[in-house]
Amino acid sequence: MLTDSVCAYCGVGCDIAAEVENNTILKVSARPDGEVSEGKLCVKGKYGFDFASSANRLGKVKIKKSFLDKHSLFLPSKIRTMLASYRVDNQGYIHPSLEEAYLLIAWKIQQVRMQYGNFAFASIGGARGNCESSYVFQKFTREVLRSPHIDNCARVCHAPTLKGMRSIIGEGAATNPFRDIHKAEFMIVIGSNTTEGHPIVANKIISAVKKGAGLALFDVRTIPLAKSAKYNAIIPFETNLMVLNMMAHTIISEELYDSTFVQKRARGFDAYKREIMNDPYADPEFFQKVKGYTYLTEMIKQISREYAAKRSLILWGLGITEHLDGSYAAAAICNLAVLTGNIGKEGAGLMPLRGQNNVQGTCDMGCLPYYNPDYEKPLVEGKKTPDIINAIGEGEIKVLFNMGEDIAHIHPNQTKIHRALEKLEMLVVNELFDNEITGFADVVFGVKSGYEKTGIYINAERRMHLSQPLIENDLPDDWEVIQGIAKALGEDMGYRSSRDIWDEVQVAAPKRFSGASYDKLTQKRVSGLQWPVFEEETPILHIDSFRTKDGLAALRYKPWFLRGMVRELLHEKRKHFYLTTGRVIAHYNNAAQTKESPKLLKRHSEDVVLISKEDASYVEGKERVVLKSRYGKSEPLKYKLTDQVRQGTLFVSFHHAKSKINFLFGDEADELTKTARFKSVKVCIE
C-alpha cells in the first residue's frame, strides 16, 4: 500500500508515495501523474528518508542540569522538587515530562518579563515545519510573549525576493506554476545551480530545451545546466544587478519593450528610462573595459533580444538574493518582465526558486518581523535575525525560542553568533536531532518530522499540499510544544488538531487561503492547490492587474555601484580569491536529515573546495587547504582542481558544520533585508 504525502526537503515540494511496513519507510517514489514531480524524484527525495527511523532522533525533552543549578536558589519549590527526582545522563541532561518542562520555561519567562519586559523575548523559526506550526509560533511570540521579534530562515535566503518583487508588482511569490516551463519559448536562469538545488525543476528546464526552448544562464561558475544552454554567461562576482540593468538598457535602447503593456499596466516608465539610459554601468559596452569578460557585451544583448521577443520565464535562486543588492536585483528581474509583457500569461513570468519545503508558507503565516499573516503590517515591527543576534550580544534580548533553525551553523558570522548564544538566560530549541544549536540550548524538545504529522506545506510555486503521516511516533508536533508552553503561562490557545489551526488561518489570511479548506486539500492531495484559493485556485498571477494598490506595476531603477572583483579587474590588481558557497545535490542545508542516509552520506561526506586549474600553483604540494577571511577561517578542507570555476574564484558547499565555512562570513548583507552576502567573500588560501 502506498501513502501519499509531500517531500520534506527543498522548495520544489514534490509529491511522494511511500511504501511502509512495520512503521518503517521502505521506499519513496513519485506518482507518475504527480503535478510537481511528473513521476521523478531527486536522490534526496528517493533515499533521504532514513532520518525518520534513525536511532539518533531526539527524545521528547531534555534540560541541561547546569541550567537548573544556575537557578536552584530561585526555582519555586514545586518545580525544584519535581525535577530533582530525575537522573542526570552522561551528557549532563535530565529528561522530565513535557508538562514539567513547560512549567519550568513558563517560570523563566515570567521572571524575565518582570525584570526586563516583553521585548526581552525573540523567536527564530525554520521553514521545514508545517504552516500550522509557523502560524502558532508567530502568534505565540506576538500575543503570548507580547514581543514583535519573530523571524524565520527566509532571512538567509529569499527575503530579498519578497522585498524586491513586492516593490514592483505587489506580490513576492512565483507568478506561474512549474508546468509553465514546458510552455516557455525562452528561459533565463540566474544565480541558481538548479540541477543540484532544485533538481526536478532542472528536469523540466532540460525537457523544455529538448523541445525547442532557448536557455540562457548567468552565473559566476559553470553549472551542469550549461550543457543544455544556448547562452552560458559567466559573470564577475557581485554583478547580477548590473547585467539585469544592461538587459533593460538593451530592451529600451533597441525599442524591444512592449509599449502597449507598459502603457496599460505600469507606471514610472519615463523616469525609469531616463535613469537607465544615463547610467554608464547599465550600458553593456561597459564590459569592453573588464578584462576577461568582454564577450558579455554582445551576449547580454543577444539574450535581451530573445527574452523580449519570446514567451519567456526568469528563474532565480540564492545567487541573486545573497548579495548587498539582492532586493534590488529581484526588483530588476521584475522590471524586465513588466517591460516585455512577460508576465500574467502561460509560459511567461517569474519563478524564484525558494529554498526550503515550506519557506513560502512560513512567510505567508507571518513569521517575519515586518509582516503578520497575509502580509499585513504589524503595529510594531520587530527585529530581523541579525538584529536579534546583536541585541542578545548587547544584553537586550534574554530569551530565544528556536524552532528548527540551526543558526549556530547555517547563518553568517558564526564567531559572533556563538558568543551571543552563550549570553542568553534561556534558549529553547525544537529539533529532530542534536546539532550545533542544541549544544547551546537549555531546553531541547524532540518533535515530529514532516513524515510523521499532518500539515500544510507551500512550495515555491505557491502550491499547497496537505501532508499526512507516513509513520507514527509519540513525539509532539512543534505547535503542540508551543501551545504547551502557552498553557503553562495561563494562555490556552485552544487547538486540538492541526485542522483547528488551519481553520483559524483561513480567517486570519483570507486574501490567500479563505477557500483552501482541509477538505478541499484532502481531495487534491497529490496535485495540491495554488494560492490564492477562493472558489478555485489561481495558477497564474497578475493576469489582469498587479497586486498593488492601484493595480499597476511600479517601474523603479536602482543603479549598480562599482566594487569588488570588477574594480580589481579594471585596475588589473588581483588581491584575493573570491569565494561563493552553495548546496550539492546529496545534502540539504545543515545535513541533519540527509547525513542519516548512508547512500547520501557516501556521495558527499565532507565539503570540498573547487579551485580553478589555473590556480594550481597556490595549492601545489598540499593535501588540504584552509580558507581564511577577515572574519575567520575554515577547518582544513579537501579541494579539487576544475574547469568549473574561473581563475581567482572558488566554490565550496557548507553542509558539514565541522568545515566551519560560515565562520568566513561577516555582517555584510542585503541593504534592505539584511540577508547575508553568502555569495561573495574575499578569502586567501593557506
Locations of regions flagged by a protein language model:
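N-terminal export/assembly segments and adjacent metallocofactor-ligating motifs
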Residues: 1-256, 264-278, 296, 485, ...
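Phosphate/diphosphate-binding loops
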Residues: 2-15, 416-417, 423-426, 430-435, ...
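Acidic/polar loop patches that form or flank catalytic/metal-binding clefts of enzymes
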Residues: 26, 257-260, 313-314, 342-352, ...
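N-terminal leader/propeptide and maturation segments of large enzyme subunits in energy/redox metabolism
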Residues: 81-94, 256-295, 470-539, 603, ...
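Extended redox/cofactor-interaction regions of prokaryotic respiratory oxidoreductases
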Residues: 135-206, 211-218, 242-245, 334-443, ...
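Short acidic (Asp/Glu) and glycine-rich catalytic loops that position anionic groups and cofactors
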Residues: 223-228, 276-284, 310-316, 370, ...
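Active-site phosphate/pyrophosphate-binding segments
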Residues: 247, 264-384, 534
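Long, contiguous, secondary-structure-rich segments that constitute the structural scaffold
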Residues: 473-524, 596-609, 614-686
